[in-house]
Amino acid sequence: MMRKSQLQFNTELRVHHPPALFRSNKIICTIGPSSQSVEVLKDLMKAGLNVARMNFSHGTYEYHQKTIDNVRKAASELGIHVGIALDTKGPEIRTGLFPAGDVVIEAHKTVILTTDETFKEKGTAEKFYVDYMNITKVVPVGGHIFVDDGLLDLIVVKISGKDIECVAQNTHTISNRKGINLPNADVDLPAVSEKDLMDLQFGAKNRVDFVFASFIRNADQVNEVRQAFGGKIAVIAKIENYQGIDNIDAIIDAADGIMVARGDLGVEIPAEKVVIAQKMIMSKCNKVGKTVICATQMLDSMTHGPRPTRAEVSDVAKSVLDGADCVMLSGETAKGKYPVETVVYMSRICCETQVTMWNMAAFEAIKNLQSFPLIPEEAICSSAVNSIFELHAKAILVLTNTGRSAHMVSKYRPPVPIICASQELDVCRLLSITRGTIPVYYDTEKLGPDYDREKRVGLAIDVGKQMGVFKEGDVVVAVHADHHTKGFANQIRAIYIK
């Protein structure tokens, strides 16, 4: 019987059906005290880690250098390709210092925020410093100011000179250097702070694979981050505020990918609106084939407990169904008690969710939204995915030196692994965030020149057999250039596995 709708497809699901054998979604893990050792990193990689994230809001350069060295050592010992991401601190707004340490702000009491630097280290419950000089120009009377991840809600009642008089809406204890969010405010902070610039230079020196750029508000800021890095780099723009949402189309166009950073975003906009923002942003990224990451509190309870809540399982599954290419873990793997178990659960949830997806409908939806005519390379790649359904093929083999063809194939959401043979190690690591890909390094010194197409196809087939992706008698689809064309995929063919 022909399936006519997603609803029809859903009615045919069965709980006892096995999960997907190969996980399409990539897993990003934040590395911290719980996960920095080589042995734990190897366990994380075996469990499903694809990208190691360093949070530059914390830690010294010595600490991050150790993380980079350990990740590369662990990946090398396992013979796999793992990406490394530098997550910038970004242009944050923070309070000053409080000599008394913890200070209680009581509900319904008046508190003054000031940009007067004489209060920089003299904060009290009645008046404390804020390090954003233009705050008096961008917040209106009646507007909200959130302190400490939204745990303290202040309403502005009066603005005078450098002072903003507010009334606390709840009681909360704050301390030194707490973050401040200004919902709906047109904040004009630069994309790259002095600290960010030094951090990016450190990243360039160590040849990190990705920069996760915090608090991106417009496309120009994406370019600022790229220029500050000083070399070729994949920039993932983190959407964390209203301005980022309002400018999302231009940001998607400028960036190499998008992260829906639900932590700060859920403070800047109402939490229930994050559901809409997530679905909208992911759909826009899917339409144009840009990588999209879902982050924050995905399996947060596993920071302290061995199993996720049912709500967290549903959240991860919903993110996959919404179109996330990658799902990200933060404190769960950085400081949690169960980092490896968390990745195991994350991988299992993704594999179970994959079998609920009607892949043909996803392919047709994306293809129908494209502007025709397509460029030849994309037409070849989309046709390769279409042939998967017609041939019941078990995999797509892509020969790529830049990752471009692999990414185009991934855009059309094939339900099978994409085995990508490349002579460039950098490309193998870049593919660590591309949905469905299995990067394979073609070592020209051992295997001969990269233009020997059949050797490269043979390598991809050997890897697929070893991994159990396909077996003798199965069909696979290959995408590559002809013998005389380099850097341009212009051929597809069906191959019977012998």
From Swiss-Prot:
EC code(s) of this entry: 2.7.1.40
Binding site for ATP: N55, F56, S57, H58, R94, K178
Cofactor: Mg(2+); K(+)
Site location (Transition state stabilizer): K238
Record family assignment: Belongs to the pyruvate kinase family.
Binding site for K(+): N55, S57, D87, T88
Lineage: Eukaryota, Discoba, Euglenozoa, Kinetoplastea, Metakinetoplastina
Ligand binding (substrate): R53, G263, D264, T296
One Pfam family named in its UniProt record: PK
Keyword annotations: ATP-binding, Glycolysis, Kinase, Magnesium, Metal-binding, Nucleotide-binding, Potassium, Pyruvate, Transferase
Molecular-function annotations in GO: ATP binding; kinase activity; magnesium ion binding; potassium ion binding; pyruvate kinase activity
Subunit structure of this chain's protein: Homotetramer.
Binding site for Mg(2+): E240, D264
Pathway: Carbohydrate degradation; glycolysis; pyruvate from D-glyceraldehyde 3-phosphate: step 5/5
Cleaved signal peptide residues: none
Protein name: Pyruvate kinase
Superkingdom to which the source organism belongs: Eukaryota
SUPFAM superfamilies: Phosphoenolpyruvate/pyruvate domain, PK beta-barrel domain-like, PK C-terminal domain-like
Catalytic activity: pyruvate + ATP = phosphoenolpyruvate + ADP + H(+)
